[in-house]
Amino acid sequence: KLTRAMSASLQFPDKDFDLIHLHGAWAREFNVERTPVMHTTQSVQSFRGSSSHLHNPFAVLARKDAGEDSGEVYGLSLIYSSNFLIETDVDAFDTLRVNAGINDRAFAWTLQSGESFATPECVLVYSDKGLGEMSRTYHKLYRRNLARGKYRDKARPVLLNSWEGVYMDFTGEKLKSMARCAAKLGIELFVLDDGWFGA
C-alpha cells in the first residue's frame, strides 16, 4: 500500500533560499508570499480535493538576492488539480530538501501484483536570470506542451458568462434572451454559470 507519493524531490547543500508561493481568495487571486527557508518543515498544500486560487500547486526556491530580472530560482509546478503538497525541510547540517507531490494527509493506494502507479508530473524550471525568466519558460512550456485543441495557437471564441448579468436570479427565458442578444453581437459562446442550482 502506498501512503506517500512524491513527484519530485530535490536536495540542496545549503538553505540560503526563500520559499515563494501564490495564495488568494475570490477576487484576490495569486498573491505572492515570500518567506525565508527555515530549520523546520514548511509547506504549501491543499486538502480541499482541488487546487485553486487559495493555494496553487506551484512554489519557487529563490536565492535571497533573486528578483524579477536576476538571481537563481528553482520553480516546481505540479500538473495536478487535487490534494497536493510542496514541502521544504532543513536538517541539522543546513541541507535543504524540497518534495512535491500528492498530499499524503489522507492518501492510501493499494497496488495489486503487477500494477503500477504514476505520480502527477512536476515541471521543474531553473533560471539564473530571476523570476521573470522562470515565468517565461513556464509560459512557453505550457503553451507548447500542455495546451491542446484547435484553439491552442488561435484566438478563442468570444464568450458571455451569465453570472454577472443575472447572478442566481435567472429563468429559462432570461437566459435564452441573453443568449439571443449575445449572438446578435457576434458572441460565439454562452456560458451558463451557476445554472446548476436549478430553477
Give the role of each language-model region.
Residues S70, A92, R152-K154:
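A short, polar/charged loop/turn motif at coil->beta-strand junctions and beta-hairpin connectors
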Residues R4-M6, E121, D193-D194:
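Glycine-rich, histidine-containing beta strand-loop boundary motifs that form or position
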Residues W109-D128:
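Short Pro-Gly-centered flexible turn/kink motifs
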Residues Y151-A199:
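Aromatic-lined carbohydrate-binding/catalytic grooves of carbohydrate-active enzymes
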Residues K1-D89, L96, R105-F107:
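Polysaccharide-binding surfaces and accessory modules of carbohydrate-active proteins
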Residues L124-P157, E164:
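Terminal connector regions
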Residues V73, S116, P157:
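A residue-level signal for beta-strand positions that form part of recognition/binding surfaces
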